[in-house]
Amino acid sequence: MLVLISVSTVAVIATFPVSQKDEAKLAAQSLFQRIQLINEEAILSGRDFGLRVDDLNRAFLFVELSEDGWKKLEKRQFGSELQLPSELVIDFQLGGNAWVKDERMFDPEPLFDQEMFAEKKQLPPPQVYILSSGEVTPFVVSIHPKQSPTESWRIVVEENGQIRLFAPGEQDEKA
């Protein structure tokens, strides 16, 4: 049933001629539903998934952990890539203090040239992990039109795994 809902959502989103504000809303709703669907799939199937966010190219890529490393999610019913129109902007922020890079004691760069021994190119690891245990990396994604950053739709994934969608102007009750 969840597959039917996600497929119908993607089909509906693709057929509407909409304004920039509506495009931001539809893109945020589509991403929100995909994250929820992948989270449920991870728990039910016992597999681990991830999400790569490319805010410069306005793209989201869902990946799956296999024996060979991270690979693009190949599901016929589920679009593994979400490309936003050029009129929209993505603001992506990982949650939690563990992801702050400014106060690291050591440089995260490898000591050795890993390219020398590399066998084949793999996808880089995702920024967001969606694990079979129900854990999800906390993050916030804001999607808004270029001309109106105040019309921002936010997807908030909290440390407890709760996934929420906020409309422009809507505030978190905890804040």
Regions found by a protein language model. Name each.
Residues 1-13:
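Alpha-helical hydrophobic helix detector
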Residues 10-17, 26-30, 40, 48, ...:
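N-terminal helix-rich module
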